[in-house]
């Protein structure tokens, strides 16, 4: 309801003062995106007994907020008197919700209820869960979850999806391959991952949790009683928050592991998927060492997990138990951070999905990707004082803009910093030791190093200067992209191979994944030698190919601009050359082939289509691309069917995990001179 009365206009003027406070907070204090929360009590409005909730955040940092806030009001049976929404130039949205006692006579203590609503606002900001948790088979369909319970439900479902197969098989097949070949190990690992993905879908997990909502609530209460901050607890029932009263009353929590086990065995078939899913939920509870779930001002929800409970020593997929795991979930993303020792460093990677299908694939593999990146980083860091770590964030489908990724990165960093504040009374710390994380740039985060460094400073972190490598020299750092530290490492291997094989003056046809917009891809182009002729480039925008050779000056122009290959001047292509955008549909190519889907063509070009358009490729330097892009399902495409030789004589794996280990061995056996990722880009680690 928008009002133009003089009284309301005066209130709007008062909002300007609030906005000034928010601007100062965004500049000098911790939270920069929101939400900013303020409760104006009835003492300021005695004449009409009016209460006011003021909620502000930056546009685009969450979704469906107004709808969700109204659901929150409905849950507490609160009626609004009027609502104002004001927008400001910085993209700031400011909601003013007005309530009167006359409209809410049925509420015993309106002040307490509104205070509770304000506390739970950050939950709907962090996790905009629009639909109610409903299962047609649910016998308790009239049992309504609280906002906190809904959030716990959503978070638990995400955790279970990623970790459930590790919880199912304590052996994980490790004994089967103890004395076997790497090829057999990779095949078994692949089948195990497929089994997990086909057996436990997101929908199945959500349906099972919905079917046993009361059990989920019992586990939530166990979680809440463990992690509810003591500063928020009080024996005075009038001072207790409504959420804490709900935790203490109603459904009883589980008081012991034995009680949970007995309940599960009595109510669930131990041969059913339900049994394993609910066991996994209990394991999630047990593994949480600290969380910001009950901190009011949060941008995302973070958990520090005990890795010994979620990774097993005898694991085929995970050969070592990490030192620490963080799990973060926000409005537009979720992610992990894995490190192998207390003091460890590694980059943070943001994964974007340009189609629903690619999102599902990225979702299925992101935990394995994060683990393998951290594990590889640990091996690369063996000659320096810091061990290895890595973080991977997966953006929700549809969120691919630069601003969306920056917002997600801010939330990821902020929520982890929340629970690095040692001995803070705002959360319960079951770990009990001080810990510091050290980040670095990776895919889609290189431009955020300065931002995150200054953000840590604004949060009051004493270690802010060492928080990230790759920051600008003005902050005491060495920008990785500017000085090309990883690129120089990769190029050294490429040029050394040329020298060893006597190819330094020989014309070589080169293919590259990872385009001129990326750190590694752009520098690889700028550092390329005169004897290299680019015949193909694949990046996030599409596929650029010319068997006669791409224009090197044009590629350098794009690399200096950090532009994607869709900006390439196509008038410079030969008659055989072409560019296919990921947005293209039903495009006819010079050889007569029709590309029905540009995204699928891009994703499969490095394998299925590469040799159809480029019969000769002498050098392949992956500078980007998804993990396991060359795997057991497509390795035969890289081998000559008649001779058994590798179709590409030289591969220097600049991108991490691009080729699976068994395929590396097959390519080497087929005569390929191959430098694996941990060797090719290790120079960047050492110099950074």
Task: Give the residues covered by each predicted segment.
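Regulatory modules associated with amino-acid/nitrogen control
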Residues: 1-90, 96-159, 166-175, 180-182, ...
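Glycine/serine-rich phosphate-binding loop and adjoining beta1-alpha1 elements at the start
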Residues: 161-162, 170, 333-337, 360, ...
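Extended, Lys/Arg-enriched charged tracts that mediate electrostatic binding to polyanionic substrates
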Residues: 273-319
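Hydrophobic, well-ordered beta-alpha structural blocks that scaffold small-molecule cofactor pockets
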Residues: 469-558
């Amino acid at each position: 309801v928008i009002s133009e009365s003089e009284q309301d206009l005066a209130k709007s003027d008062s909002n300007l003062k609030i906005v000034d406070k928010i601007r100062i907070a965004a500049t000098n204090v911790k939270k920069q995106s929101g939400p900013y929360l303020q409760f104006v009590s009835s003492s300021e409005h005695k004449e009409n007994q009016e209460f006011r909730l003021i909620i502000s955040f930056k546009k685009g940092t969450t979704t469906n907020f107004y709808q969700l806030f109204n659901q929150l009001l409905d849950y507490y049976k609160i009626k609004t008197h009027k609502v104002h929404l004001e927008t400001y130039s910085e993209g700031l949205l400011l909601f003013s919700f007005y309530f009167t006692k006359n409209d809410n006579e049925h509420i015993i203590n309106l002040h307490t209820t509104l205070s509770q609503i304000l506390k739970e606002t950050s939950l709907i900001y962090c996790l905009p869960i629009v639909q109610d948790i409903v299962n047609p088979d649910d016998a308790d369909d009239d049992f309504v979850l609280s906002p906190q319970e809904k959030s716990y439900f959503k978070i638990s479902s995400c955790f279970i999806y990623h970790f459930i197969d590790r919880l199912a098989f304590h052996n994980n097949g490790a004994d089967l391959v103890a004395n076997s070949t790497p090829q057999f190990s990779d095949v078994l690992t692949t089948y195990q991952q497929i089994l997990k993905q086909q057996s436990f879908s997101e929908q199945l997990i959500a349906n099972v949790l919905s079917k046993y909502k009361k059990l989920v609530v019992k586990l939530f209460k166990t979680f809440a009683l463990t992690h509810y901050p003591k500063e928020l607890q009080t024996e005075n029932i009038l001072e207790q928050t409504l959420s804490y009263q709900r935790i203490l009353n109603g459904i009883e929590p589980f008081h012991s592991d034995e009680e949970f086990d007995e309940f599960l065995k009595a109510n669930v078939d131990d041969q059913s998927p339900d049994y394993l899913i609910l066991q996994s939920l209990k394991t999630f509870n047990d593994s949480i060492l600290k969380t910001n779930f009950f901190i009011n001002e949060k941008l995302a929800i973070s958990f520090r997990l005990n890795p010994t409970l979620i990774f097993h020593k005898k694991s085929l997929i995970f050969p070592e138990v990490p030192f620490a795991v963080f799990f973060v979930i926000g409005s537009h993303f979720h992610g992990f951070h894995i490190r192998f020792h207390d003091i460890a460093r590694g980059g943070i990677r943001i994964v974007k999905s340009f189609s629903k299908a690619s999102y599902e694939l990225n979702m299925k593999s992101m935990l394995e990707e994060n683990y393998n990146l951290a594990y590889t980083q640990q091996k690369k860091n063996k000659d320096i004082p810091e061990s290895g770590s890595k973080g991977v964030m997966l953006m929700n489908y549809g969120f691919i803009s630069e601003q969306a990724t920056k917002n997600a990165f801010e939330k990821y960093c902020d929520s982890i910093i929340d629970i690095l504040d040692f001995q803070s009374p705002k959360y319960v710390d079951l770990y009990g030791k001080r810990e510091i994380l050290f980040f670095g740039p990776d895919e889609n985060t290189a431009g955020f190093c300065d931002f995150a460094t200054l953000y840590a400073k604004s949060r009051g972190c004493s270690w802010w200067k060492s928080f990230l490598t790759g920051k600008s020299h003005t902050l005491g750092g060495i920008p990785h992209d500017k000085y090309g530290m990883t690129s120089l490492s990769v190029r050294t291997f490429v040029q050394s191979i040329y020298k060893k094989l006597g190819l330094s003056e020989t014309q070589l046809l080169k293919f590259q994944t990872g385009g001129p917009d990326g750190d590694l891809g752009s520098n690889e182009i700028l550092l390329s030698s005169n004897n290299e002729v680019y015949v193909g480039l694949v990046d996030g925008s599409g596929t650029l190919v010319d068997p006669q050779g791409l224009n090197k000056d044009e590629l350098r122009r794009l690399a200096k601009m950090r532009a994607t290959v869709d900006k390439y001047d196509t008038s410079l292509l030969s008659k055989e050359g072409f560019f296919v955008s990921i947005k293209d549909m039903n495009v006819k190519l010079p050889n007569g082939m029709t590309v029905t889907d540009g995204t699928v063509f891009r994703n499969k070009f490095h394998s299925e289509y590469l040799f159809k358009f480029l019969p000769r490729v002498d050098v392949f330097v992956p500078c980007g691309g998804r993990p396991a892009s060359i795997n057991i399902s497509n390795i035969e495409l890289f081998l000559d069917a008649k001779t058994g030789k590798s179709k590409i004589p030289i591969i220097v794996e600049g991108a991490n995990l691009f080729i699976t280990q068994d395929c590396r061995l097959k390519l080497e056996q087929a005569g390929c001179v191959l430098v694996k990722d941990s060797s090719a880009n290790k120079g960047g680690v050492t110099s950074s």
